[in-house]
């Protein structure tokens, strides 16, 4: 996962005009990277995070369709907040990515150092996809990620 992130960081020249092909390319690269990171963290630390425990509790309290809409909404709102509003408040790329990924991680209530590292990593990749494509790219990645986690763990 570190190699994947470093490669993405090396590719950090921002695209000015983003087409659907580029968006899908970066969404795919980001998704595979997130999958590798999550699998590695799962092998190291099998216990779920506080965020996962909260989501499991919520999932059992509401109909599945409502929970699915919640995940979709969370993906869109989080990306708009972190990688549009906050993103545009800061000019320097390194600070943009660091600020948004740290705040993203904090919002997901990491209860352990490993959970913290996982959410920071997720935030880093969402930030790099945002930079290499656009807000729709990071929203798409976040949405695909949340839906994949839902299908794999909650159904």
Task: Annotate the PLM regions.
Residues 12-74:
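Juxtamembrane helix-loop-helix connectors linking adjacent transmembrane helices
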Residues 1-11:
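Alpha-helical transmembrane segments in multi-pass membrane proteins
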Residues 64-155:
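Transmembrane helix-loop-helix hairpins at the membrane interface
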